[in-house]
Swiss-Prot record:
InterPro entries: Dxylulose-5-P_synthase, THDP-binding, Transketo_C/PFOR_II, Transketolase-like_Pyr-bd, Transketolase_BS, Transketolase_C, Transketolase_CS
Organism of derivation: Clostridium novyi (strain NT)
Pfam families: DXP_synthase_N, Transket_pyr, Transketolase_C
Subunit text: Homodimer.
Record protein name field: 1-deoxy-D-xylulose-5-phosphate synthase
Catalytic activity: D-glyceraldehyde 3-phosphate + pyruvate + H(+) = 1-deoxy-D-xylulose 5-phosphate + CO2
SS bonds (residue pairs): none
Pathway this chain belongs to: Metabolic intermediate biosynthesis; 1-deoxy-D-xylulose 5-phosphate biosynthesis; 1-deoxy-D-xylulose 5-phosphate from D-glyceraldehyde 3-phosphate and pyruvate: step 1/1
MF-aspect GO terms: 1-deoxy-D-xylulose-5-phosphate synthase activity; magnesium ion binding; thiamine pyrophosphate binding
A single Gene Ontology CC term: cytosol
Residues at which Mg(2+) binds: 146, 175
Lineage: superkingdom: Bacteria
Length: 623
């Protein structure tokens, strides 16, 4: 029975609830989340860990005037329930349904949209400074996890916060996890605070003595210096306070009464304050508590067993993971780098077999790329496995530190193209465009997961940067693997008719299906696998143009700056410079200049006319 949950009317009720009722409400919210996400899938473990914290925040703050920014945003399901969206969970992350992240168009209480990590403090600080310049009165809060705190942007923001003394509250949600287990110096530092409460007890007792003792100024100054020295011994660095940020904690992130008291204290302090809360990712569901990594983002699952309802087959991530282990056996110079995504990118097996050659840098893509550059300069063969959407964060480093020096770094780009339910902030539809204009960069796309190992071996033997991009999941049809590669040379799969469909990566399977459907309609098509996006195969394009082919390019990337534009530009140059007298026409198919929302992969390709039927319709238009 969910008496409080079922009768909940809005945020104003939280401020009137007793702590015992809030504790009951927390359990009812957990039951609701476990039940709903078991059917739809979603980010379960992170949301189960912030139930009490969210309730405490919304009991203290008035969201009609105060502002709260949630870092990453995948832990905002409780926020969505409390702000009136519980009835939309049946369509969570589905096309046309509720987003799994904050969306300003969904609610006035979604103050800032997030998806990538480490942005909340910067955004909240911007809001706080806007408040001050406009002479407004409100509280601004950033909620950030210990994983996100490993991101350089978060540290940059803290540095700015402490320097300018802006009134801002930062809640550190410390669950010792990002998606997987946290790594690095920041994580180690926080661990020392968690397990050693001596400083916090000392600070409270010391301040109490000073308040009760009548002493002179000189003695007080000496004692303050003594206090400073002792706290350095007890908690080395006192990282936050030395940056000029008042530190409160660590406190139990599942004790609503204690949370409320500390938040109220922070609310009444001048200058920036950081509240350090300790939470358990997956709390309240035994399977998520035992394996929070698996329940970070999970598909529909069985409530009683915790097992995923639909077991996926072979994936590109697994193919990459197997391939890099095999490659590392042959070449001791191979090293693997990830930015807090070991399991997601398929590197678990490598990390266990070659722990000294595996480097998880935390949520620090910029650092990861330049680390790889340094390794390459020193004779190693670094392979950086990263999701397409997160490689965006290291754009400058790829250009400045890798391509500019023409260093042999391999980028294994996972989750390229449409990833589905995570939505706009996670779709991998920009990488071809931002990599395509980088000098010295070679870009490859396997048409089948069996090609990953051959591409990876080829890439690792080059003396310049190579990016291999591949989609989430596996293959829709079985295609024979191309096993040998010559830079810039494509693969002709079908030679029929005077229409050439040139596809890259995952879209080759779509092209094959289109060819079969068009043939049944009496139209013959030549299908070409553009296994190299950069450089393009100029000899094939020149041949097609000289024979007046209608050329159609097909990619799972935005059209602007993408693969198709490279083909179009070269084909046009052949015609406009009078190199070839041709009536060829080039049509580019890909994603338009817009952000792609959440939904299933199949539905999103269909909605953008990049499924088989959509491509066929586009071909018919130019016949």
């Amino acid at each position: 029975m969910s008496e409080i949950f079922d009768n909940y009317k809005g945020l104003y009720e939280l401020r009137k609830m007793s702590f015992s009722d809030l504790d009951k409400f927390a359990q009812e919210i957990r039951n609701f989340l476990i039940n709903k996400i078991s059917k739809t899938g979603g980010h379960l473990a992170s949301n189960l860990g912030v139930v009490e914290l969210t309730l405490a925040l919304y009991k203290v703050f008035d969201l009609d005037k105060d502002k709260i920014v949630w870092d990453v945003g995948h832990q905002t399901y409780v926020h969505k329930i409390l702000t009136g969206r519980a009835d939309r969970f049946d369509n969570l992350r589905q096309f046309g349904g509720m987003s799994g992240f904050p969306k300003r168009c969904e609610s006035k209480y979604d103050f800032f949209e997030t998806g990538h990590s480490s942005t909340s403090i910067s955004a909240a600080l911007g809001m706080a400074r806007a408040r001050d310049l406009k002479n407004e009165k409100c509280n601004v809060v950033a909620v950030i996890g210990d994983g996100a705190l490993t991101g350089g942007m978060a540290i940059e923001a803290l540095n700015d916060v402490g320097d300018k003394k802006t009134n801002l509250i930062v809640i550190l949600n410390d669950n010792q996890m990002s998606i997987g287990k946290n790594v690095g110096g920041v994580s180690t530092y926080l661990s020392r605070i968690r397990i050693d409460p001596k400083y916090n007890k000392f600070k409270a007792d010391f301040n109490d003595v000073l308040r009760k003792t009548n002493i002179g100024t000189g003695v007080a100054d000496s004692l303050s210096k003594l206090k400073s020295g002792i706290k350095q011994m007890l908690v080395p660095g006192m990282f936050f306070e030395e940056m000029g940020i008042k530190y409160l904690g660590p406190i139990d992130g599942h004790n609503i009464k204690e949370l409320t008291e500390v938040i109220n204290t922070a609310k009444n302090l001048n200058g920036p304050v950081l509240i350090h809360t300790i939470t358990q990712k997956g709390k309240g569901y035994k399977f998520a508590e035992k394996d929070p990594n698996r329940f970070h983002g999970i598909g529909a699952f069985n409530l009683d067993t915790g097992k995923v309802s639909k077991i996926s087959g072979d994936t590109y991530s697994k193919a990459f993971g197997d391939a890099i282990v095999e490659l590392a056996e042959e070449d001791k110079r191979i090293v693997a780098i990830t930015a807090a995504m070991r399991d997601g990118t398929g590197l678990k097996k490598f990390s266990e077999k070659y722990p000294k050659r595996f480097f998880d840098v935390g949520i620090a893509e910029q650092h990861a790329v330049t680390l790889a550059a340094g390794m390459a300069q020193s004779g190693l063969k670094p392979i950086f496995a990263v999701y397409s959407t997160f490689l965006q964060r290291a754009y400058d480093q790829v250009i400045h530190d890798v391509c500019h020096q023409n260093l042999p770094v391999v980028f294994a780009i996972d989750r390229a193209g449409i990833v589905g339910s995570d939505g706009e902030t996670h779709q991998g539809v920009f990488d071809l465009s931002f990599l395509n204009h980088m000098p010295n960069m070679t870009i490859m796309c396997p048409k089948s997961l069996h090609e990953v190992k051959y591409m990876l071996k080829w890439a690792a033997n080059q003396n310049s940067p190579v990016a291999i991009r591949y989609p989430r999941g596996g293959d829709s049809i079985e295609l024979s693997a191309k096993t040998d590669y010559i830079v810039g040379k494509w693969e002709v799969l079908k030679t029929e008719g005077n229409i050439a469909l040139i596809a890259t990566g995952k879209m080759v399977a779509t092209a094959i299906k289109v060819q079969e459907k068009m043939k049944a309609m009496g139209v013959n098509i030549t299908v070409i696998n553009a296994c190299f996006v950069k450089p393009i195969d100029k000899s094939i394009i020149k041949k097609l143009v000289s024979k007046n082919y209608k050329i159609i390019t097909l990619e799972d990337n935005v059209l602007s700056g993408g693969f198709g534009e490279s083909v179009l530009q070269y084909a046009n140059s052949l015609i406009t410079t009078n190199s070839i007298n041709s009536e060829s026409k080039v049509v580019n198919l890909g994603f338009d200049d817009k952000f792609i929302p959440h939904g299933s992969v199949d539905i999103l390709y269909k909605a953008n006319n990049l499924d088989v039927d959509g491509v066929v319709k586009n071909i018919v238009k130019i016949l």
